C-alpha cells in the first residue's frame, strides 16, 4: 500500500519482438527489439519516457515485420539488451507497470533477464497490472484490443498504422486514464466524501449571499483569454468539454 502523500509512480509499457512461438513458451528463442514506456506520477504524464531499439542475436520474423515494421537493417547499429538492461531496470524498478496483455511482455522481459543471468523477475521489482484484464472486467463479452478500446472510448489512434512500442504505450496511457476516471481527482482521494460535502456547503453559502452582488462584464482581453482556455479544455478532453457543449446548445436556440 502506498503511504499517504507519497507520489504514485506508474509506467505504461509496451514491447516489440522478433516474433513469438505458437506452441510452448511464446518467448523462447526470440528477443525484444523495442521498448517504449511513459511515466505517470499521480496520474499525470511527466514526459520522462523510456524508448529504445535493441539489436537481437537473431533475424526478425517476416510475420513480425508485418506487424511492427522493424527490420534487421533498422536494428543493425542499435545496442544489444545486455548494454541497456541495467538502465531499463533502474527506470521501472519500484513502479506499477501498466501493460496490455501483460503476460506477453513480462514473459519476454523475464526471459531477457534470465539470458543475462540477472536473477530478476519483473514482478519482484514492480507491481504489474494487466490493462487487458481490467478491460475484460469492465466490458465483458466485447473486443478489448487497444484499437477496440480506442474506438469505444473516443481516443484518437489514427497514427497507429503499425504497432510501435512508444506510440502504443502513449495510447494505452490515454486508454487507462479514461477507463479509470480521467484526470487526477480535485480532492484528496482519502477524504472524497468530506471534500464534496464541504464544497456543497460553500456553494449553498455563496448562493445565499450573492443576490445583491454587482455583475461585472469581462473586457475583450479577458473574454478572449476565457475562450482560448475553453478551446484548450476541449482539446485536452478530446471534444468532451461540457462548457463548450453547453455554449453550442445555447447558440442553436
From Swiss-Prot:
Active site (record annotation): 163
UniProt binding sites for substrate: 14, 16, 63, 68, 168
Positions with a binding annotation for a divalent metal cation 1: 14, 16, 168
Cofactor binding description: Binds 2 divalent metal cations. Magnesium or manganese.
Pfam families membership: RNase_T
Subunit: DNA polymerase III contains a core (composed of alpha, epsilon and theta chains) that associates with a tau subunit. This core dimerizes to form the POLIII' complex. PolIII' associates with the gamma complex (composed of gamma, delta, delta', psi and chi chains) and with the beta chain to form the complete DNA polymerase III complex.
The protein, known as: DNA polymerase III subunit epsilon
